[in-house]
Amino acid sequence: GLSVCLHRFNSTIQDRLKLINDVFMNMTDPNTQIKRVWVSVGLKDLEYIEAILHQGVENIIIDVANGYMTDVIGFASKIFHKSEKRIKKIMLGNVHSDTILQDYQHLYTYLGIPIYFRCGIASGSVCNTRGMTGYNRGQITEINECADWVDSNHSNLMLVADGGIANPACATKAFGAGAEYVMMGGYFAHAKESQHVIDEIYKFWGGASEFQQIMSKGIAERHSEGKERDINKDDLLSLDKLVSDLWGGISSGVSYSGHKTLTDFIGNGVFELKV
């Protein structure tokens, strides 16, 4: 099923708490739907984390670009114990190889809750990390390597493909490479219902872009490894249409591959490389 991640690019804690409250107030089945809401936090957001736990948030994404930082695992352990087990799931990342996954597995064993990790660095459709840092790997390569590690080590970690998903075909490929979940921010940015800054012709969206840093107020100035993108309003679709197209594309892709279910298809895609 679909889950939603709430971002942290509002100017104040109060603004972010209002966003969470608005989402919770519009739930038709809170007991079930609250388990599908993730909230993004930074390494300095201890006060904010306590506030969102008080609101009923259970799932935390530690939102840093570099999941290899030693602070990330320590921070995850710290907030879990401070939460008195109110945190039910934690998502780490981002990573581009399997070198850190053993440490993530140790964290799972220590905390005893599901640990997810985002796989993908420099592959996002509004990511400029490659241009700024010179670093990138192919997204399929990253996913496949990490998925192989999870499988061969009988790991309990959950792999989340993050970056480069422009259409349903991209999501299908991510699942085929071994992802169990896929981040879909770029795809759902085309929804009429999504949050954007709107002018007469375009609506803008982006990641850690200069535009977003300016509009988000209070974000420290630094170099940008993201960029904003214009979306012509004539190209926007309803959320229902986007979800229908997504599931239809994935279902057909699974069928073409000779598998009956998405679960069977995950990690069993066959890729032909053209050189």
Label the model's feature ranges.
Residues G112-Y116, G134-A161, I165-V275:
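Alpha/beta catalytic cores of nucleotide-metabolism and tRNA/nucleoside-modifying enzymes
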Residues G1-M158, G186-F188:
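Active-site entrance/lid segments in N-terminal catalytic domains of soluble metabolic enzymes
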